[in-house]
Amino acid sequence: MPGLSWWDEEPAEDYLDAFRSLVLPQTTVLVGEHHQLWRWLLPEWSGNKPPTARDIARAAADAGTPYTLVTGLAGPSEQHVENQLATPQGILVSVSFERFEGVFVGAGETLSAALTGLLALGTELETAVSEALGYLDQALAHGFRPGMGHVLPDRLFWAQTDVTEDDDEQDLPATSNTR
């Protein structure tokens, strides 16, 4: 689910309506941040508490999407964030990670790409979600700020080598990442 905060309201609404009617019926797993999905799928929500991942999954299922991965839910503490794969019947996977400082750009895209790749390889949905979330957590942990702006996930964190004291590795460049 792309962020549309920079769009004017009317074109954004037209886009969201088209997305709802044309794309959701063709979607197996909808991936999105809790507040974005809430505003889009449940704009008239009147509950005393924010909608749960299951509430959002019900709304997505009404449009033809059987699974919804909701990210950015309040975790068990202020320092944690919860991510849940839900259906209208219940929560299939719930993974909690430590919350990172900073504002990230590309986290949702990184998660969606990782999940898509794992599913394309034939990984079971619940396993793919857990692995994709673990990959995202590491990409964010190794994230970098290329300038004065937001932090980008380091999607190639796994390919970086750490410099050790071994003589054979003294010529390798050191890697440095900032959060």
Model-predicted regions and their roles:
Residues R39, G102-L125:
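Short, small-residue alpha-helix embedded
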Residues M1-G3:
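N-terminal glycine-rich phosphate/adenylate-binding segment common to multiple enzyme folds
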